[in-house]
Amino acid sequence: LNHYSVDVDYLISGRAPSALFDMSAFGEYQWRQGLSFATQNGRVDYFNTYRQNSFKQFWSDVKALDLSTYDLILTDYEPVTAWAARLAHKPCIGIGRQYAFKEPSLYSKLSLLQRGLIDYFAPASRWLGMHWQPLDNCIPPIVREQQSETELSERHVLVYLPFENLEQVVDALIPLKSYQFSVFHPSIKQTDNLDAPHILGFP
C-alpha cells in the first residue's frame, strides 16, 4: 500500500509490546490489548482463552477507535479494527489464514463453536483467505518476490509452528545438527541450530 502512495495507519493487538519484533516497517503504529487465543499443544484452549482476555477492555477499545477519517479497513483477523469497522459501517477486508475457513468445503467441517469464532472474532464485509490448497476466494501464502541477498541454502529451514508445544518442537529439531532452523514461535530463543527469524533475516 505504501508503494502506491496510500496513506496507511497500523494498529497492532493481541501480543504484549515487549513481545513484538521487527516493527520499524510500521512506523508509529498504534497498539491495543485486543484479544488472543490461549493454546495447548497446537489446539485452542477455550477455557483459558476466555479467562485470559479482558472483554471489557476490548469493547472499550473498539468503541473508542475513531474511524471517521478512513476509507477502508484491512484486518488480518485482528478484532479491534474489524469490530470498530462494523460499528462504524466502514468497509472492511479481512485477509488471512482464518478467513479461508469461510469457504464452504472447510466451513462445513467446523463445529458450531469454531464457526462462531470464524464468523465473529474479526468480522469483515469482504474477505480473502490464505490457503496452501486451491480454493475459491483464497490465495496461497504471500512470499516476497524480492529475495534476500543472502545466499540460499537447502539446509536453512523455516518452521512455522507458533501454537505447538515448544519443548516438543525443539526436541524434534535439535538432533538435526546439519540443518539451521528459523522457528516462528513466540517463546523461541537462540539455541544451537535454532533461531528466531525476523523480516529481513531469512533468505
Regions found by a protein language model. Name each.
Residues 3-57:
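Conserved nucleotide-sugar phosphate-binding/catalytic loop shared by glycosyltransferases and other
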Residues 3-10, 68, 177-182:
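A generic structural motif
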Residues 11-13, 95-96, 130, 184:
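Generic beta-sheet signal
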Residues 40-72, 77-80:
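Conserved nucleotide-sugar donor-binding subdomain of glycosyltransferases
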Residues 86-103:
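Active-site proximal beta-strand in glycosyltransferases
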Residues 88-91, 124-125, 177-179:
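A short helix->loop->beta-strand "cap" motif at the edges of active sites that frequently abuts
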Residues 102-166, 183-202:
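A nucleotide-sugar donor-handling region in carbohydrate enzymes
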Residues 165-183:
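Short hydrophobic signal-anchor/transmembrane segments that target glycosyltransferases
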